[in-house]
């Protein structure tokens, strides 16, 4: 072997996960482009757009999936949603366990990164429990939807549609097989409750769900779990009330519905914008205040280690508490008698700042390439970033450049700003300490 030959490329866990995810998107795009997958031919760009949308559990679609894809194509979408939602490494661990092989240290480190865990201890057991819990929830959800849909559609279609929409709901992907999404079920209690509860559970994050299942008492729950549960309740209630107040006089959305349908629609649309892009009213007809409020919800997003996107609800909560502490003149940020480390606050600020800058730059770029209002463009970008999937009817009309930009935003939103930064840069620790310097701010 000659000296000076290049060393084999060593990838850290974030880089490996990013590459594995891109590989999933490419394979999905190729499968969706196959003649067996479509009723009518679609472009390569649309195939990769939909593959990215499914793998990132977003739900934005330039074409109607229900009328475009064959059963094979829809199953490919379903698999992409499931693998993308629960994580590639989680499924890789399942395969290794089934084959009866040992899981090495490198695989455990990948699992630790994928599941966002502070240590290696118990990550394999956690992955197995995550899979079992997910499959159980999807079985329950599919059964509930089947009770409503089988009598209306027949056994085969009813069961299949129940399974597809349950997987999409639990993984917080707003894909539906009807051109109007779920608008035809605006007043249906079973559909509204089943889909919304699956979305909430999927959006809480498995660490919260398992903490609640194992501890069962409020006192024993971790600070993260308590914060997620309280913030989820507050944000959901505020969203439901706000949407009802903003839209109840709009004849194109809630105004034309009965009072019970208005209440169901407000409830459903209040819960889904943070994580899953299902809709029972026409999003393109929303009044401007509602659209702006939904942009905020989509930006905040779901919980850490969940199937949803956004900057994450706890990130937003930490920033709010830190700002309040600063305004009160306190040097430390305290949440329920627990001091939050400065590194966590800086991490939250970094995530929010990078995300806002990225959204601004992409929205600015889209104003140059697309013929649409700034509000519709911002809505589309934040929906892609939050891996939500709601659109003001803009996705089918995007230009080629516009679609490529939205694909990039969906990937950025799914992988997360810090994961991408760690993939590119190698964080270095230094023992050098410099004297303090003062800078005027504000």
Please tell me what each predicted stretch does.
Residues 1-442:
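Membrane-proximal intracellular helices of multi-pass ion channels
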């Amino acid at each position: 072997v000659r000296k000076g030959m290049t060393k084999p490329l060593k990838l850290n866990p974030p880089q490996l996960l990013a590459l594995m995810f891109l590989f999933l998107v490419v394979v999905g795009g190729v499968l969706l482009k196959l003649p067996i997958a479509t009723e009518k031919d679609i472009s390569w760009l649309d195939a990769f757009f939909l593959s990215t949308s499914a793998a990132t559990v977003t739900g934005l679609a330039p074409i109607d999936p229900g009328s475009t894809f064959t059963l094979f194509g829809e199953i490919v979408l379903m698999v992409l949603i499931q693998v993308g939602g629960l994580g590639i490494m989680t499924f890789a661990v399942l395969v290794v366990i089934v084959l009866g092989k040992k899981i090495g240290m490198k695989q455990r480190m990948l699992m630790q990164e994928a599941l966002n865990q502070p240590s290696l201890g118990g990550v394999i057991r956690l992955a197995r429990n995550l899979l079992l819990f997910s499959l159980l929830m999807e079985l329950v959800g599919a059964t509930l939807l089947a009770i409503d849909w089988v009598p209306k559609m027949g056994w085969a279609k009813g069961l299949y549609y129940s399974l597809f929409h349950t997987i999409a709901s639990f993984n917080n992907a707003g894909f539906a097989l009807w051109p109007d999404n779920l608008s035809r079920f605006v007043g249906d209690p079973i559909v509204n409750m089943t889909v919304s509860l699956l979305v909430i559970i999927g959006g809480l994050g498995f660490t919260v769900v398992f903490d609640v299942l194992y501890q069962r008492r409020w006192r024993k729950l971790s600070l993260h779990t308590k914060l997620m549960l309280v913030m989820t309740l507050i944000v959901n209630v505020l969203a439901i009330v706000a949407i009802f107040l903003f839209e109840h006089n709009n004849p194109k959305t809630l105004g034309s519905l009965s009072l019970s349908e208005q209440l169901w629609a407000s409830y459903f649309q209040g819960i889904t914008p943070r994580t899953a892009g299902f809709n029972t009213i026409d999003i393109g007809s929303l009044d401007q205040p509602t659209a702006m409020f939904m942009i905020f919800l989509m930006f905040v997003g779901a919980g850490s280690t969940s199937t949803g996107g956004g900057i994450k609800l706890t990130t937003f909560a930490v920033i709010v508490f830190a700002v309040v502490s600063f305004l009160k003149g306190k040097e430390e940020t305290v949440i329920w008698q627990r001091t939050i480390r400065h590194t966590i606050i800086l991490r939250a600020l970094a995530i929010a700042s990078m995300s806002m800058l990225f959204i601004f730059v992409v929205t600015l770029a889209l104003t140059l390439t697309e013929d649409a209002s700034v509000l519709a463009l911002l809505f589309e970008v934040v929906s892609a970033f939050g891996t939500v999937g709601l659109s003001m009817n803009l996705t089918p009309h995007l230009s080629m450049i516009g679609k490529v930009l939205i694909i990039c935003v969906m990937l950025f939103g799914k992988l997360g700003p810090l994961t991408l930064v760690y993939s590119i840069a190698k964080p270095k620790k230094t023992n050098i300490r410099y004297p303090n310097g003062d800078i005027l701010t504000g």
